């Protein structure tokens, strides 16, 4: 691997980076900007060797943006962990807010949003995952009029990320929900104990979603993950990177079934 270019922005933390499917536009999140405006930055990555900042967008995002998602001509940006705004980028030099989604309840919080086939999967901690129509048509929603139509939550209240996944081997569709738990709190100067696992949920009946399987690595909690060609790649904090075979029907405890096919302990 070799670095071929870079950009420098005013931020204490860039927590998320997403690139459009056509590979032309990158959006990054900002927290802790000295200007206190935070927001997002759009970058032209058409030529990865000569990347250029196109614009920044800060309206309603000054509290900090932890996660973003880019889908076609819209960006979905979390605002201060309370809601997400939908921003049109038909003209990336002049982004425009067109919509917003939040739960209509006191104390709600959001950690992540992922869009697939016109559905936004909103990860809302103790409130679980919300399925929101932002253009699919299943509930009459659009980017400018997000409409919630499904929800699943569970006892730990630690839902922080969602990955919609269709099995190549069976054609079945799963909504994979990840926990993020620190049983003894967070020590920024040391190694932390983590817990939690991945929940595989069948939303075939949106009014009665069913959790059918899990991947739980004893002694370690989950964080980010990716699924490709029925292979799960999941970061498990001190448990390193775990690689899991998801082919065939998914039922029960996938770890105990011996589906793990590889791992990399990145901290050693």
Task: Show which residues each predicted segment covers.
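Feature marking well-ordered beta-strand scaffolds used for ligand recognition
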Residues: 1-268
